[in-house]
């Protein structure tokens, strides 16, 4: 009996360091190892990095110019938030919680575009974890207080505005009253209207202009459509629930606990100001479609990716509930490679055939990618890579990890 108990204790002591090693977390800086020290084939990893560098996007680094060549050509496409020129193609590779490779300008703060959406959904997740949102299947309208647009000039009662609403009603139409938090999080709401001067139909409009204003609405939850106006609706709805600026919530409850730097900023639009409890507050955006969104370094992006790799846990603290992260990773029935914004899934290995089906990615225009691979214990941040080269890069990266040095 004593021998058996002793054997059990010895096994426990042996496995404890292994468990701790499997759950390594960075302090103020990432622990660093060479690829060889981390058990990664150095030459194959170099091949992957060289492939990424050779696959830099051809778009101009002047992102304001790039905007007016792309999204800026849409109806009402003017940029109304800040835009910043981008840097070099940059990457950071984290394996088993240790930084094994970096290149480019990983400290540089750049626009991360729609990776912002993953941070936005996380702030909604914090509201869910805290009981402020009881269920994602609840009707969003039931959580809304009146929203006053901030205007420093007293114009709301002028005669030329007689009959115009003084308040923003996000969910006032019969269709919008049926929208749940889940619909907004999965981009299946078909929300109708305009917010911050951007009509829902003006984002990636169809080639049928006659239908832009007249098409019948799809029942909420029945059609998936990627749409930044509707994501910005979610951001304003979340602000209305939190009653405080979302960047403050993110900083206090996620970025500080995971040790992010103080260099990131989350911007909204010039006109996206409302009054919350007597104070003007900017409602942030879910991306850089019309400017704004999250401006952040690759190092800090890697920390967020690592948080989601560990299912919301950081050290001994559960920053985001595991339940929330698992919900975010649940495929949207209408769009199986998509979970909550902006979790792109590898369901049936359709998105990236070279990666495991359990891998997922936080994606943004550019391409900004935060690749998360639980099977290989990997996080890879790559910025400004051609989207068509992503699977080729992942194929080479995974080969480097799989084939020991």
Spell out what each predicted region is.
Residues 7-17:
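Bacterial N-terminal signal peptides
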Residues 19-106, 130-133, 244, 400-405:
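N-terminal leader/targeting segments and the immediately adjacent pre-domain N-terminus
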Residues 41, 97, 111-136, 184, ...:
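Active-site SXXK
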Residues 55-58, 139-263, 299-302, 307:
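Active-site-adjacent helix/loop patches that line small-molecule binding or acyl-intermediate pockets
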Residues 81-94, 102-144, 218-223, 292, ...:
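Short active-site loop at a secondary-structure junction
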Residues 118, 122, 187, 230-237, ...:
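Active-site-proximal alpha-helical segments within enzyme catalytic domains
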Residues 262, 272-288, 326-379:
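Active-site Gly/Thr loop motif
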Residues 361-405:
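Structured C-terminal helix/loop/strand segments within mature extracytoplasmic catalytic/sensor domains
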């Amino acid at each position: 009996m004593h021998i058996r108990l002793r054997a059990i204790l010895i096994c426990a002591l042996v496995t404890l360091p292994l468990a701790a090693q499997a759950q390594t977390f960075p302090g103020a800086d990432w622990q660093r190892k060479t690829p060889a020290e981390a058990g990664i084939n150095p030459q194959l990893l170099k091949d992957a990095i060289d492939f990424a560098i050779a696959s830099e996007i051809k778009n101009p680094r002047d992102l304001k110019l790039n905007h007016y060549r792309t999204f800026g050509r849409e109806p009402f496409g003017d940029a109304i938030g800040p835009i910043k020129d981008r840097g070099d193609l940059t990457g950071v590779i984290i394996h088993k919680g240790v930084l094994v490779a970096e290149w480019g300008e990983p400290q540089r703060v750049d626009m991360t575009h729609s990776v912002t959406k993953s941070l936005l959904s996380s702030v909604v997740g914090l509201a869910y974890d805290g009981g402020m949102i009881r269920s994602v299947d609840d009707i969003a309208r039931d959580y809304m207080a009146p929203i006053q647009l901030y205007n420093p000039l007293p114009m709301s009662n002028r005669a030329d505005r007689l009959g115009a609403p003084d308040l923003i009603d996000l969910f006032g139409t019969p269709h919008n009253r049926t929208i749940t938090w889940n619909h907004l999080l999965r981009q299946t709401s078909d929300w109708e209207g305009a917010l911050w001067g951007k009509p829902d139909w003006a984002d990636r409009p169809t080639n049928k202009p006659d239908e832009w204003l007249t098409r019948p609405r799809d029942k909420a939850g029945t059609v998936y459509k990627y749409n930044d106006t509707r994501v910005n609706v979610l951001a304003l709805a979340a602000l209305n629930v939190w009653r405080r600026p979302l960047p403050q919530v993110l900083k206090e409850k996620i970025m500080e606990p995971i040790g992010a730097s103080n260099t990131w900023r989350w911007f909204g639009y010039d006109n996206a100001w409302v009054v919350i409890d007597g104070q003007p507050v900017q409602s942030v955006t879910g991306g850089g479609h019309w400017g704004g969104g999250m401006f952040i370094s690759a190092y800090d992006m890697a920390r967020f990716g690592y948080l989601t790799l560990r299912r919301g846990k950081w050290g001994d603290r559960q920053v985001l509930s595991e339940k929330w992260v698992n919900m975010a990773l649940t495929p949207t029935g209408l769009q199986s490679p998509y979970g909550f914004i902006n979790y792109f899934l590898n369901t049936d290995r359709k998105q990236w055939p070279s990666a495991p089906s359990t891998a997922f990615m936080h994606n943004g225009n550019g391409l900004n990618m935060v690749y998360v691979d639980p099977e290989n214990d990997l996080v890879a941040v790559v910025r400004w890579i051609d989207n068509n080269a992503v699977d080729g890069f992942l194929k080479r990266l995974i080969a480097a990890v799989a084939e020991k040095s």
